[in-house]
Amino acid sequence: MASLRKTHPLLKIANHALVDLPAPSNISVWWNFGSLLGLCLISQILTGLFLAMHYTSDIATAFSSVAHICRDVNYGWLIRNLHANGASFFFICIYLHIGRGLYYGSYLYKETWNIGVVLLLLVMATAFVGYVLPWGQMSFWGATVITNLLSAVPYVGGTLVQWIWGGFSVDNATLTRFFAFHFLLPFIVAAMTMLHLLFLHETGSNNPLGLNSDTDKISFHPYFSYKDLLGFAAVIILLTCLALFTPNLLGDPDNFTPANPLVTPPHIKPEWYFLFAYAILRSIPNKLGGVLALLASILVLMVVPILHTSKQRSLTFRPVTQFLFWALIANVAILTWIGGMPVEDPYIIIGQIASLTYFALFLLIMPMAALVENKVLGWQ
């Protein structure tokens, strides 16, 4: 008789996804980040739920309620530090996961990849509205600057901004709705994650060689379930160390000052994980152009599968494109640095060059390099 996990309607789904799933035998540690993102999402939802029990979404008490959580609630300081730094780990895992996808050609599973890009946009939206909730200086001014970008939309821009704000400035209505969005979006992310996995399991995982691995598969459990647990342990230890030893390392000191609409901070900047996109936004002198470039910096990922010109899937045996891939990583690091710098020379020109290089690498240089590699190998 077949075991219950293979026959029960609900357990059968879990079994096919987590136990008897055929997985390539050679997938490396770079394939761990999907499960780590699942861990981050669960961790963020749980810590966020406990924070929401004590938080008040009113401009008169929001800042004080966060202070109250840290001072008076049992382990509130720990829950808050885990939640704030958990967001950083979430984005570290996302960027490594995307980097893995770009390097090994996983983007050729188009449905999985496109849902992944939508997931990235949703997580970015969640993080943005979440950053506004403590109602510190950077929360308030970050919300003002970023929502104001919508005014660049032709014809309806002004109306759109007032609609988002719920008034004529970032005020109580804005904070209340941002709290509602911040509570709702993670559950939408969880639902989209299910779709992401559904489409992934239609094709099976890619592998470091970029070759068909149907002839060499092993079951997910116990091999990769234990491998994932090792990754979980590593991330939990790192997150706990960050939350306990240097909880404010990645935060902005300005956010320890309550929001004041009359005083603008000297340098308005988002959290570190948005700096690369913020640098691209700032490098274009035109408002609408900047907004479009900001959107394009993420949506460019959607055209990567269309621009795949190589006869090989992964970069494992493509040294020229490998070099360009690492140039792209360095470029994003430069953009991240520039995003945190004031708008003055030489930072302006460096940001503009890095922004141009970012798009050129995706849209022009890497597809052309792949064609050259095909020609050298006599594969065209």
Swiss-Prot record:
One of its GO terms (biological process) is mitochondrial electron transport, ubiquinol to cytochrome c. Heme b b566 binds at residues 97, 196. It is a multi-pass membrane protein. Its cofactor is heme b. Pfam families: Cytochrom_B_C, Cytochrome_B. Keywords: Electron transport, Heme, Iron, Membrane, Metal-binding, Mitochondrion, Mitochondrion inner membrane, Respiratory chain, Transmembrane, Transmembrane helix, Transport, Ubiquinone. A ubiquinone binds at residue 201. Heme 1 (or BL or b562) is low-potential and absorbs at about 562 nm, and heme 2 (or BH or b566) is high-potential and absorbs at about 566 nm. Component of the ubiquinol-cytochrome c reductase complex (complex III or cytochrome b-c1 complex) that is part of the mitochondrial respiratory chain. The b-c1 complex mediates electron transfer from ubiquinol to cytochrome c. Contributes to the generation of a proton gradient across the mitochondrial membrane that is then used for ATP synthesis. This is Cytochrome b. It comes from Pagrus major (Red sea bream).
